[in-house]
Amino acid sequence: MAKRTFESSLSKLEKITEELESGELSLEGSLKKFDEGIQLAQFCNEQLEGARAKVEILMKKDGKVQAVPFEEE
């Protein structure tokens, strides 16, 4: 089984969204796709939060470049 990545999960989530928006799925099929989509969205969100925690901004202070944590405004 292939390792789940952010990119593959996002692509699958986009496909599920298209399938749900098409209106061609049964109620049961729609619920299954919705559940799968929720799981994929949670995975993507976790990946984004992890990436955000790793982002650092390089600041020049006293002639030296220093890494500081990223803070949202």
Curated annotation (Swiss-Prot):
One example GO MF annotation: exodeoxyribonuclease VII activity
Catalytic activity: Exonucleolytic cleavage in either 5'- to 3'- or 3'- to 5'-direction to yield nucleoside 5'-phosphates
Top-level class of the enzyme under EC nomenclature: hydrolase
Listed SUPFAM superfamilies: XseB-like
InterPro entries in the record: Exonuc_VII_S, Exonuc_VII_ssu_sf
GO terms for cellular component: cytosol; exodeoxyribonuclease VII complex
Superkingdom of origin organism: Bacteria
GO biological process: DNA catabolic process
Sorted UniProt keywords: Cytoplasm, Exonuclease, Hydrolase, Nuclease
EC number in record: 3.1.11.6
Leader peptide range in chain numbering: none
Record flagged with keyword Cytoplasm: yes
Cellular location(s): Cytoplasm
Similarity-based family: Belongs to the XseB family.
Chain's role: Bidirectionally degrades single-stranded DNA into large acid-insoluble oligonucleotides, which are then degraded further into small acid-soluble oligonucleotides.
Subunit structure: Heterooligomer composed of large and small subunits.
Name listed for the protein in its UniProt record: Exodeoxyribonuclease 7 small subunit
Organism: Desulfotalea psychrophila (strain LSv54 / DSM 12343)
Lineage of source species: Bacteria, Pseudomonadati, Thermodesulfobacteriota, Desulfobulbia, Desulfobulbales
Gene, per the UniProt record: xseB
